[in-house]
Design a protein with these regions (language model features):
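Short beta-strand/loop motif that positions the catalytic acidic residue
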Residues: 166-168, 172
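Short alpha-helix in the alpha/beta-hydrolase fold that links the catalytic acid
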Residues: 33-38, 152, 176-186
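C-terminal catalytic histidine-bearing segment of alpha/beta-hydrolase fold enzymes
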Residues: 178-224
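Primarily recognizes the serine-hydrolase "nucleophile elbow" in alpha/beta-hydrolase
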Residues: 103, 108-159
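Serine-hydrolase catalytic machinery in alpha/beta-hydrolase-like enzymes
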Residues: 2-113
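Short, proline-enriched alpha-helix->beta-strand connector loops that line the catalytic pocket
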Residues: 159-164, 190-193
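Alpha/beta-hydrolase-fold catalytic nucleophile elbow
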Residues: 53-54, 115, 139-142, 167, ...
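Short helix-capping segments at alpha-helix termini
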Residues: 41-46, 106, 131-134, 188-192, ...
Length: 224
């Protein structure tokens, strides 16, 4: 993933003071979550730049090699082994380049939030375990840590434990709820503050979830 990622950008007002970089799930693209921005916004919030990158197109092993947009290859059904580690690492690096671009525009890391759904969430959580950047927070929707054992053994940089909003469907057939619960447990053990939500839905996003996420974002923006 040596080329810069193409992105969809939505600025809520001129001169953004904050940025949210939001990664989509397998087979989707950067347009997938762009429509929810108006559902999250509160009138008193500062200007925010939402950045929705497109993942590169690549063959996906579990889907018989059919090419689609993906942050990494999925090798099988076993959640302990399914993620292509090199692909995850490459996407973490590409995400870092997006963060650097926002910093270059004048938004400090302390005012940048990372969000991701499914595969996208797996990438932002993996990044949080590797980076020493003081990111403002993580939004992990219907997702998991690709290498849970490695995460459990991780040594997170001192003080670099941003707050995490996690939400998951109780009837998710793609990423079972138990896998997400295990991920939340490991993150808590590592010292990440977790706000956890579970909803009676499948592999999706619901209105109640967006309301809770808006409340969480409100607290993050007010704390700065």
């Amino acid at each position: 993933m040596s080329h810069p990622l193409e992105t969809v950008v939505n600025e809520t007002a001129a001169n953004p003071e904050w940025a949210v970089i939001w990664l989509h799930g397998l087979g989707a693209d950067g347009h997938d979550f762009a429509p929810i921005v108006p559902e999250l916004l509160r009138p008193h919030w500062p200007a925010i730049r939402f950045v929705f990158p497109h993942a590169p197109v690549q063959p996906i092993t579990i889907n018989n090699g059919v090419p689609m947009r993906a942050w990494y290859d999925i090798l099988g059904m076993d959640f302990r082994l399914r993620a292509d580690k090199d692909g995850v690492a490459a996407s973490v690096q590409a995400l870092g380049a997006l963060v650097d671009a926002e910093i270059a525009r004048g938004i400090p890391a302390e005012r940048i939030l990372l969000a991701g759904f499914s595969q996208g969430g797996a990438v932002i959580l993996s990044a949080a375990l590797r980076w020493t950047r003081p990111i403002a927070g993580l939004i992990a929707l219907s997702t998991y840590l690709p290498d849970l054992q490695a995460a459990a053994d991780a040594r997170v940089a001192d003080g670099i434990r941003p707050p995490v909003f996690m939400a998951h469907g109780q009837h998710d057939p793609v990423i079972p709820l138990a896998v997400a619960v295990d991920t939340a447990g490991v993150l808590k053990t590592l010292g990440f503050p977790i706000q956890w939500h579970a909803y009676p839905m499948a592999h999706a996003v619901c209105a109640e979830e967006l309301q809770a996420l808006g409340d969480w974002l409100d607290a993050r923006l007010a704390a700065a």
